[in-house]
């Protein structure tokens, strides 16, 4: 992508950690757990860690029902959990920018062998279990649609026991879903490091535009084999946002719940709330994030109400200033975000791109030849939908999945893209389309590369999970 990631890499390595929870051993009974997830060291010196609240849910005295919306206050103290809960935190060496790995061994030694081993586990105690109410409100708005559109999420605690017939059909209403939006603030006993460097800087999520580059630093599979997986990196972009609920196409795996997501300049933007999600049993290639600034704004006053005023002041000091300007669209994406349109054809909907004031290009399976009329909704705020009809569509047997719509009225204020004439394997591309969320929060942005270019032979296929959107270089 032609940019330097040094600051983000250093911040992620310095802040990344793994948190594990298990029950104490009792005579005649096996200990519960262990469960683990990723976390963020807000400061090694202060020993404060944020992680996903799902691993604490099994130890709640009132059960996971205490995390359900409307069940009680949006925060719980340490006394809400059983006394037999044991928490541990493991972190890496946290080399800074420009630091070099130690001398390698033989010439064939892989580069990862020069990486210092993770530190041993340190005991930690729970200070606060806090929910971000704004995140939960945005979550309810995005994911509480028609009953037929079942959503399922992975990550955030122990998997619920489900009947096989219900698997993947939205039956995930147990502790896993209840814990979405809940995060745990821990204190590491003995502090993480006596000279642990500066606190993290926290970015205002609203200041980042769609398409802004992001770097996720987490540990896939949690505490399983940290020598290999601790603080693994995944690069992506900010795909969309609904308040403090952010979506990214950075690839996150189970175990990265609670991982930090950083901007290119090394500021903490968000924590992973759910690494994987499905709609109607189809995987949606986006991860759910909770904005760090919104989470800290909820956690700081909650600590104060629990009498932990010193810790509350520490969190408040991390917050970015209020009242920042809304993010302006990225220059390379501004026109595409407006040129993308939502197309509704009966019960089917997809994306398209405006090529002229009265012409829209989309996929045949979105608007088939037999469709009498289709509704086109521009992405421009407060613009009116326009009716159109299919004037061209490839045959069902054709390898090309293309349809052209002629509109009854011209699209106003929509910039039209310049068509590319040359293509290069490996070049960066971005897709702007309405994806799985329709018009709820506008078009989404995903990033990738042009994997192959086929000329004069068979056409290439690109899977984007957003049928019909423009692909930009």
Sequence positions of predicted segments:
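Protease-domain processing segments flanking chymotrypsin-fold serine proteases, especially trypsin-like
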Residues: 1-35, 303-347
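C-terminal subregion of chymotrypsin/trypsin-like serine protease catalytic domains
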Residues: 262-325, 333
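Catalytic nucleophile loop of clan PA
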Residues: 40-41, 249-272, 353, 450, ...
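A conserved glycine-rich beta-strand in the N-terminal activation segment of trypsin-fold
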Residues: 25-53, 258, 338-357, 363, ...
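Serine endopeptidase catalytic core focused on the charge-relay Asp
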Residues: 11, 16, 33, 56, ...
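A structural connector/turn signal
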Residues: 37, 202-203, 247, 328, ...
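Conserved, well-structured beta-alpha core segment at the onset of a catalytic domain
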Residues: 1-76
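A glycine-centered beta-loop-beta connector
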Residues: 44-47, 211, 261-269, 358, ...
């Amino acid at each position: 992508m032609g940019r330097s990631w040094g600051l983000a890499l250093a911040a992620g390595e310095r802040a990344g950690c793994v948190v594990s929870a298990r029950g104490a051993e009792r005579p005649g009974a096996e200990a519960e757990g262990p469960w683990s997830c990723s976390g963020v060291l807000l400061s090694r010196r202060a020993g404060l860690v944020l992680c996903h609240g799902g691993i604490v849910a099994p130890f709640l005295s009132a059960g996971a029902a205490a995390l359900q919306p409307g069940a009680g206050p949006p925060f719980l103290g340490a006394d809400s959990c059983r006394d037999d809960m044991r928490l541990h935190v493991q972190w890496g060496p946290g080399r800074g920018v420009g630091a070099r790995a130690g001398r390698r061994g033989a010439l064939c030694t892989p580069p990862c062998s020069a990486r210092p081993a993770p530190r041993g586990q340190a005991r930690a105690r729970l200070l606060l279990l806090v929910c971000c109410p704004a995140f939960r409100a945005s979550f309810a708005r995005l994911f509480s649609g028609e009953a037929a559109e079942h959503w399922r999420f992975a990550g955030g605690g122990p998997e619920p026991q489900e009947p096989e017939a219900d698997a993947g059909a939205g039956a995930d209403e147990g502790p896993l879903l209840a814990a979405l939006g809940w995060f745990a603030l821990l204190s590491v006993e003995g502090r993480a490091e006596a000279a642990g460097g500066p606190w993290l800087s926290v970015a205002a999520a609203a200041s980042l535009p769609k398409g802004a580059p992001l770097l996720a630093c987490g540990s896939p599979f949690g505490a399983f084999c940290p020598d290999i997986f601790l603080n693994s990196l995944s690069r992506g972009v900010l795909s969309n946002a609904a308040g403090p609920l952010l979506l990214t196409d950075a690839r996150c795996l189970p175990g990265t719940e609670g991982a930090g997501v950083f901007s290119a300049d090394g500021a903490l933007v968000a924590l992973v709330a759910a690494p994987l999600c499905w709609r109607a049993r189809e995987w949606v290639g986006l991860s759910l994030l909770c904005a760090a600034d919104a989470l800290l704004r909820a956690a700081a006053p909650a600590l104060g109400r629990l009498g932990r005023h010193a810790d509350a002041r520490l969190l408040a000091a991390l917050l970015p200033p209020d009242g920042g300007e809304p993010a302006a669209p990225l220059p390379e994406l501004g026109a595409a975000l407006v040129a993308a349109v939502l197309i509704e054809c009966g019960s089917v909907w997809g994306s398209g791109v405006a090529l002229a004031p009265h012409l829209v290009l989309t996929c045949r399976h979105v608007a088939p030849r037999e469709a009498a009329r289709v509704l086109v909704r521009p992405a421009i705020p407060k613009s009116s939908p326009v009716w159109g009809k299919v004037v061209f569509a490839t045959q069902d047997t054709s390898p090309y999945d293309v349809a052209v719509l002629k509109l009854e009225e011209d699209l106003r204020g929509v910039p039209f893209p310049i068509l590319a004439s040359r293509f290069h394997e490996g070049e960066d591309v971005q897709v702007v389309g309405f994806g799985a969320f329709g018009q709820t929060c506008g078009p989404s942005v995903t990033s990738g590369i042009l994997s192959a270019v086929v000329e004069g032979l068979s056409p290439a296929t690109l899977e984007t999970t957003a049928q019909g959107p423009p692909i930009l270089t």
